[in-house]
Amino acid sequence: MNNIYQKDLGLQQYTKVFEDMLEFTSTRTPETNDEIWLVEHPAVFTQGKHGKPEHILNSHNIPIVATDRGGQVTYHGPGQAVIYFLLDIKRNKLGAKKLVTTVEQACINMLDKYYNLKAHIIDGAHGIYINNQKIASLGLRIKQGKSYHGIAINTNMDLTPFSYINPCGYSGLKMCQLANFYQEADIKKVQQQYTAEFVTLLNNSI
């Protein structure tokens, strides 16, 4: 069983957490414990490493940050449960594809187990959907066998800024959030519930 430290970072600027992820990943050793970071960000658009500027329709003065994760542009804001995975994927016997599958399946399991919601994936469009509306976005980076970045689960937030972009590069993609189904949706609970499901899947795969 893998020892994974959880860190609840609270509300943090995206750029600060991004820099911290880079530093953690570049300085870790084979003995460094894996970590999962739980965080919430002030309003920000983040652009993937191959992101196309035309997918940002109108930023409405929301900051735009270029990152090195996979995927296109997405939005982070208050009320969104963000979970970052700082893992040694070789030690966890994970390839890139298996890591993505585990991240996605943990979200599907969580929504089913705790909220009785039947979520699904769409081939070729990473993320988690309910009735073809996207509830969770993911973007990961693996560098020298170490992962960082993660998943963002729309929980109880203002979804309006998603209309300012083509989310994940898809024009007209409809977004949803847990609060559409459960008014009292709470990001702290979602982060803990998700992490429990993820760690269970991870340990079962080792």
Swiss-Prot record:
GO terms for biological process: protein modification process. It is found in: Cytoplasm. Residues 30-206 form the BPL/LPL catalytic domain. Gene3D superfamilies: Bira Bifunctional Protein, Domain 2. It catalyses: octanoyl-[ACP] + L-lysyl-[protein] = N(6)-octanoyl-L-lysyl-[protein] + holo-[ACP] + H(+). Keywords: Acyltransferase, Cytoplasm, Transferase. The active site is at C168. Substrate binds at R69, G70, G71, Q72, V73, T74, Y75, H76, S137, L138, G139, G150, I151, A152. One of its GO terms (molecular function) is lipoyl(octanoyl) transferase activity. Its EC number is 2.3.1.181. One of its GO terms (cellular component) is cytoplasm. The record marks K134 as: Lowers pKa of active site Cys. CDD domains: LipB. Pathway: Protein modification; protein lipoylation via endogenous pathway; protein N(6)-(lipoyl)lysine from octanoyl-[acyl-carrier-protein]: step 1/2. InterPro entries: aa-tRNA-synth_II/BPL/LPL (IPR045864), BPL_LPL_catalytic (IPR004143), Octanoyltransferase (IPR000544), Octanoyltransferase_CS (IPR020605). Its main location: cytoplasm. Catalyzes the transfer of endogenously produced octanoic acid from octanoyl-acyl-carrier-protein onto the lipoyl domains of lipoate-dependent enzymes. Lipoyl-ACP can also act as a substrate although octanoyl-ACP is likely to be the physiological substrate. Belongs to the LipB family. In the reaction, the free carboxyl group of octanoic acid is attached via an amide linkage to the epsilon-amino group of a specific lysine residue of lipoyl domains of lipoate-dependent enzymes. This is Octanoyltransferase. It comes from Francisella tularensis subsp. holarctica (strain LVS).
